[in-house]
């Protein structure tokens, strides 16, 4: 992918102070419902990212409380049900074997990663989710978090310091305060704000189809703008590096059967490789240059 191609299809997806809208996305890295939101968020950013900046707000206390109260077996079963319903694989095997040691640490690590930039935080969050839900790694353990930081090409020494710093603690406390003030009781929750309009934002709690989020965005914009061009499939895979068949289906308005046909063509051309998950399928882009570090794809 050339820089011009990247700019043409993806530059508008990043944060910019002149965008009229901001979306607060309240998440917990341990929440399978937040993981299930990935396809809709990808599509919204690709089609209308020129209008909004996405701000990640950690709401760890909500999921942490549920993790501590519910029996491991029941929690694992809930993960499996969410995977079957959403199409985003969640393997609850880890929860049968052990309890997550320090649920808050995953959100603290997210804030530590964000100290190296908003984009770094988003990449770190995605990699945490892949590690937990696909690879059954305990992202509440520091060694796992350090491996994720290295994989997402953060400054590792800086991340180690920040993970134990007051800066990360204060950032997390600020997020929890925002969640309390906005009466966020569960994750995921998206709150849409328009800087050009007075009044409170619109809050959407729960996991819905892409069309619901698009409708709320239009309502807050007061307009139904034309969507940005969706990138060709190969460029999409190259940019994100590791994606679920469900994500492709949502972004391109395809059935899973159509996704399978199109991805087989790329696999035959040795552009991608298939990665089977417990529920569904993922696809990894094959980098021509091995030193071209991947954006995502956290492996075991």
UniProtKB/Swiss-Prot annotation:
This protein's name:
ClpXP adapter protein SpxH
The Swiss-Prot or TrEMBL record describes its family as follows: Belongs to the SpxH family.
Q: Which gene encodes it?
A: spxH
Keyword Cytoplasm among UniProt keywords: yes
Enumerate the CDD domains for this protein: DsbA_FrnE_like
- Listed InterPro entries: Adapter_SpxH, Thioredoxin-like_sf
UniProt keyword list: Cytoplasm
PANTHER family this protein is in? CLPXP ADAPTER PROTEIN SPXH, GLUTATHIONE S-TRANSFERASE KAPPA
Instruction: Note the subunit structure.
Output: Interacts with Spx.
Task: Name one cellular component (GO) term.
Answer: cytoplasm
Role according to the record: Adapter protein required for efficient degradation of Spx by ClpXP under non-stress conditions. Interaction with Spx stabilizes Spx and exposes the C-terminus of Spx for recognition and proteolysis by ClpXP.
**Protein's cellular compartments:** Cytoplasm
């Amino acid at each position: 992918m050339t820089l011009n191609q990247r700019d043409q299809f993806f530059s508008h997806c990043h944060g910019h102070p002149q965008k009229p809208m901001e979306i607060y996305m309240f998440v917990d890295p341990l929440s399978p419902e937040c993981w299930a939101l990935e396809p809709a968020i990808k599509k919204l950013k690709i089609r209308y990212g020129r209008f909004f900046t996405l701000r990640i707000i950690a709401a760890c206390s909500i999921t942490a409380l549920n993790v501590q109260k519910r029996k491991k077996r029941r929690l694992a079963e809930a993960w499996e049900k969410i995977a079957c319903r959403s199409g985003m694989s969640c393997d609850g095997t880890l929860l049968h074997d052990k309890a997550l040691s320090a649920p808050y640490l995953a959100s603290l690590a997210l804030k530590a990663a964000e100290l190296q930039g908003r984009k770094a935080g988003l990449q770190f969050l995605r990699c945490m989710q892949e590690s937990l839900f696909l690879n059954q790694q305990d992202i509440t353990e520091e060694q796992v978090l350090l491996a994720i930081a290295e994989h997402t090409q953060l400054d590792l020494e800086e991340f180690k310091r920040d993970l134990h710093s007051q800066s990360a603690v204060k950032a997390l406390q600020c997020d929890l305060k925002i969640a309390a003030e906005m009466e966020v009781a569960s994750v995921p929750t998206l709150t849409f704000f328009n800087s050009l309009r007075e009044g409170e934002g619109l809050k959407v709690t729960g996991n819905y189809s892409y069309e619901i989020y698009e409708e709320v965005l239009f309502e807050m914009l007061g307009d139904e703008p034309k969507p940005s061009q969706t990138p060709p499939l190969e460029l999409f895979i190259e940019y994100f590096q590791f994606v679920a068949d469900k994500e492709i289906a949502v972004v391109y308005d395809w059935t899973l059967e159509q996704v399978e046909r199109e991805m087989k063509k790329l696999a035959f051309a040795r552009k991608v490789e298939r990665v089977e998950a417990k529920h569904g399928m993922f696809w990894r882009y094959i980098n021509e240059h091995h030193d071209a570090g991947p954006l995502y794809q956290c492996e075991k």
